[in-house]
Every structure is written in C-alpha cells, then in structure tokens.
Amino acid sequence: MNATAAQTKSLEWLNRLRANPKIPLIVAGSAAVAVMVALILWAKAPDYRTLFSNLSDQDGGAIVSQLTQMNIPYRFSEASGAIEVPADKVHELRLRLAQQGLPKGGAVGFELLDQEKFGISQFSEQVNYQRALEGELSRTIETIGPVKGARVHLAMPKPSLFVREQKSPSASVTVNLLPGRALDEGQISAIVHLVSSAVAGLPPGNVTLVDQGGHLLTQSNTSGRDLNDAQLKYASDVEGRIQRRIEAILSPIVGNGNIHAQVTAQLDFASKEQTEEQYRPNGDESHAALRSRQLNESEQSGSGYPGGVPGALSNQPAPANNAPISTPPANQNNRQQQASTTSNSGPRSTQRNETSNYEVDRTIRHTKMNVGDVQRLSVAVVVNYKTLPDGKPLPLSNEQMKQIEDLTREAMGFSEKRGDSLNVVNSPFNSSDESGGELPFWQQQAFIDQLLAAGRWLLVLLVAWLLWRKAVRPQLTRRAEAMKAVQQQAQAREEVEDAVEVRLSKDEQLQQRRANQRLGAEVMSQRIREMSDNDPRVVALVIRQWINNDHE
C-alpha cells in the first residue's frame, strides 16, 4: 500500500513537472550550457608534454614539490609513468629545475664527494671517485637522443711502479634505448670516445658498449659488411657534389629543370701503405758524395845493380817513370785509385796507394695511400628538348650536344686512364611525371596543425549549433507558443472583462436613470403636494386640463 502511494506521488510529481512549461526549458538550457562549457574548456585545455620520465621516487617527489610551489599544473601519465606539464612551459621548467639540481638521476655524480667525512681512507676515497665518475658518465650518455638510460662500469687497475706490470683500464657501458630507436655508427663511436677521453689511460679499444637486448655494439665495422655508414655517406657526398657541379654548369644553358644528372662513383676504401727503396749508379765523379778516402805511401832505399841490354842503350840514363792513377769504372760502389812511383835509377824506391769510397745513391720512399680515392666515375646526363615560342619541342643540335658533353667532362673531371664513362642523352621530359619539389601547402605539417586547431573550434561550434537546433530552440519555441497562448487568453479575458465592465456600466446608468427618475417623481410629487396645499385651485385646473387631453 505504501509502495503504491509512493508511486502515485511520484507520478503526480512528474505530471506536475510535465505540466509546467518552464521545467523542460530549464533542463535543456542547463544541459546546453554544461556541454558548451565542457567543450570550451576542452578546446582551451593546454597541451601537456612530458617533463621528465623514468624518475626515481626521490626525484619524482622533489619535482612534484617544486611544481606545487611554483603553482604549475601537472599530471601523471599512467602509460609511461612520466610527469607532464603544459607544453609552453616544458623548457622553462627544465631550466629552473636544473638550476636546483633536479632530477639527480638514479646514479650519483660528483656530489658524492661533497659528503665525504674527515679521516676517510684512501681506498674509500678512490671507490667514491670511481662511483662519481661512473655516475657522471651515465648522465652524460643519457643526454644522447635515442638513449633512455645508461650505466657505466669502470675497471681501474691498481697503479704499479713497474712498467711491465702496469695494466690499462677498461669500461663497460650498457644503454637502454627508446622504443623503436637505435644508435648509428657515429653515435656508437662518440660514446666510446667519450668514455675513453674521460678516463685517463683508457684506450677506445677497451670500451665495450651493449644495449638492453644484449647486443654488442662495439664490434668491428667490417665483421658483417664491407662498408660502414661513414663510407656510404662519403660516397654519397662525392656523387652528390659531382652531380651538383654538372647541373650548375649546364642549367644556365638549358634552363632550370631541363637537365637531370646521375653519378656513380667507385671508391677505394682500402688502407694502403707502400715503402720503396731504389739504388742508382753514381754519376759524374765531381758530383758524387765522398764517404771516405785512404792514402798509402811507401819509400825504399838501397844499392842498385846495373842492368839492361849491353851496349850503348844501357849507358844512357833512364827517363823518369811515373806510375799512372788507375780509376775503376764509374758504376762501382767503391772507387779505388792507386798511384805508384818507382825509381830504378838508384837505390831509392817510392810507392803511393790511394783508395776513395763514395756514398751509395739510394732513394727510400714511404707512401700512404688516401682512403676513398676515386677509382672510376660513371655519369649519365639527360637534357630536355628546347621549347619553341609556339610551344613545340625541338631537339638540340649536334653542336649543342657536343658542347654539353665537353662541359660535362670538365665538370666531372673525366679521366680516360681511370676508365670513366659519360653518356649524354637529349630526350623530351614527361611533364606529367614530375616528382620531388616542395609539397603542396595542404600536405605540409604546419597547415595540418592549423587545420586541426581550426577543426577543434569548428567542432565546438557544430555541437553548439546542434544543441541550439535540437534542444534549446524547440523549448524556446514551445515557450514562445505558450506565452503567446497565455497572452491570447489574457487578451480574451481583458476583452470579456471590458465587455462586462461596459455592460455593468450600462446597467449602472440605467439604474442611475431610474433612480434619478424615482427621485424626480418624488420631488415632483412633493412639489405638487406643496402646491395643492398652498393653491388648490391651480391644481384643480391642471387636473381638469389632463382630463380634457385624455378625452381628446
């Protein structure tokens, strides 16, 4: 019974609400205002960006405390666990927090040395220094774009007084990369040399770099491929430089966009060193370099015995006998000259020997070949037809093609010894197959961003229009119709009241007239009564006159 009564009361309350035309209007208006406010707040809501991620609990609490003191709105990202702030304040907040030493990071740096106590042992001091150095290196490596986190382990050998017992330090680096990111050869080399330069006596070969997947990143570049990224980039730069030179020298002749060139360069990346030693025979003795000279002279004296052919010839004195200097051939390395003089005219004998040694004409040449020398060039050039004033294409003449080919040879540095090849073709370009160039404005990212921002406000206006059209406007229409009906009813009521008032006024006038008539009759009868009392004869004459008029 109570439930039925409550249900009846609820139905009666709903019927009363439905009967009241203001209730739907109020509800629809409130809903429209709420939706509009929500959409405006959504449109004006700031775009949140990541301030810091992968923070420790200490750093996260300190950063949140500082943001609260600065009255900066922030929120936590459930997916990445990062602290997000409005996009326009990210860089400012990072600088302000960095000024306060936040975040400190999971690894401690040189601030660990600020907490050393007095009387600490040398071993503990060395361990703290090594920990601080590892932490600073980890922080530095984490500043590289693809690196999400890093850890560094240093193996520092104990110094020794003996040279043969000294060992080089080594380092192991583990990097945690961002999803979908990787380190290229240049970044790997940069990390290796960064660690090597930060530790005294650490050669780059003793640095090992490993990613979170356990992949060794510091393996030799030639262990799995012939060319590394640096060599490929160098080859691409060489080809691009030659291509730009060809297009730059031919564009003023045939016009911009009327020439396309492709260059293929074969480069030699082998590291070569050559040592050459040459020996040549000595030239003129006057220009030869004297290395050493030895001179021997001997003299003998004694009795001489006569000899010779008997006769007159033997009685003649013998002429002076000079021993000639014998010179070996010029192509010998050691030259020897001997001079001997013997006198048979008496007991005296003299001998002279001279030996000269000259330097060997030797040439030693050590040549280190350049890495990346061009071994061969292959160039292909396509030149468009020239366009006549009437719009018709016309091929270039043989002289023009010969001129273009000669200019291309000079621009590319053509060498027959190297085996270079060049092919120049004159062909009409297909204008419908144009590629490259600047993207249309509707495909540019700036236009897309502006379109998205405008679309957000357009969505707000569209929802507002739909609310006005479907919710607010019908209620206002019904409200206006109800007000009009009420006004019509009021006007009809006023007309009825006016008619009633008019009718009432007529009745009142009739009653007033009747009252006046009654009052006039009473006054007349009173006057007649007074007149009959005062002058009965006049009254009798009046009555006689009335009677006569009635008979007539």
Curated annotation (Swiss-Prot):
Transmembrane ranges, per UniProt, are 23-43, 447-467
Q: What is the annotated localization of this protein? A: Cell inner membrane; Bacterial flagellum basal body
Query: What are the boundaries of the region Disordered?
Result: 272-362
Write out the biased-composition intervals (Polar residues): 293-303, 313-325, 346-358
Ranges of biased composition (kind: Basic and acidic residues): 272-288
Entry's Gene Ontology molecular function annotations: cytoskeletal motor activity
UniProt GO BP: bacterial-type flagellum-dependent cell motility
Record keywords? Bacterial flagellum, Cell inner membrane, Cell membrane, Membrane, Transmembrane, Transmembrane helix
GO cellular-component terms in the record? Answer: bacterial-type flagellum basal body, MS ring; cytosol; outer membrane-bounded periplasmic space; plasma membrane
Locate the compositionally biased regions of type Low complexity: 328-345
User: Membrane topology for this entry?
Assistant: Multi-pass membrane protein
InterPro entries per record: AMP-bd_C_sf, Flag_M-ring_C, FlgMring_FliF, FliF_N_dom, YscJ/FliF
Q: Which Pfam families match?
A: YscJ_FliF, YscJ_FliF_C
Function in brief = The M ring may be actively involved in energy transduction.
The protein's assembly and partners: The basal body constitutes a major portion of the flagellar organelle and consists of four rings (L,P,S, and M) mounted on a central rod. The M ring is integral to the inner membrane of the cell and may be connected to the flagellar rod via the S ring. The S (supramembrane ring) lies just distal to the M ring. The L and P rings lie in the outer membrane and the periplasmic space, respectively.
Question: Family per UniProt?
Answer: Belongs to the FliF family.
Q: Which PANTHER family match?
A: FLAGELLAR M-RING PROTEIN (PTHR30046:SF0)
* Protein name, entry field: Flagellar M-ring protein
Query: Coding gene?
Result: fliF
